[in-house]
Amino acid sequence: MAAKVEPFWKRKTLAQLDQDEWESLCDGCGLCCLQKLEDEDDGSVYYTRIACKLLDLQTCRCTNYAERIRFVPDCIQLTPAQADEFQWLPPTCGYRLVAEGRDLPLWHHLVCGDPEQVHKERISQSGRMLSESQVAEDDWEDYLIFRAG
């Protein structure tokens, strides 16, 4: 009987992941592509339902991932070197969970094998977002959905 091999996210640090492993940690929820507002008084970060103009509002995937920085210069590119800053990410985020030494949830595609499960479980905001091109920036605070952290 062959020994059971632990999944890569349990036996490697973020810095040890190859590019494919790193990219596969993304569960496709799209939450990191939502516009966020910071409270000037206490520094709290709040997520809105307002999505980046490149985010597909149904699939929660970037419509131009390869060239996203060209079209959205302030797009956040997550890297292993930033792991100590991941607390602004949703508590369900694979990058944040692995950085914190925790396991991926049962609905994560690497665990269950179904990339649609993130939508079926309503972890993503699929179908509940608005494009930033539809809402004036001054009105974003009307669309807060949760506080990060």
From Swiss-Prot:
HAMAP family: UPF0260 (MF_00676). Belongs to the UPF0260 family. It comes from the Bacteria. This is UPF0260 protein PSPA7_4092. It holds the Pfam family CxxCxxCC. Transmembrane segments: none annotated. NCBIfam families: PRK05170.1-5, PRK05170.1-6, PRK05170.2-5. The lineage of its organism: Bacteria, Pseudomonadati, Pseudomonadota, Gammaproteobacteria, Pseudomonadales.
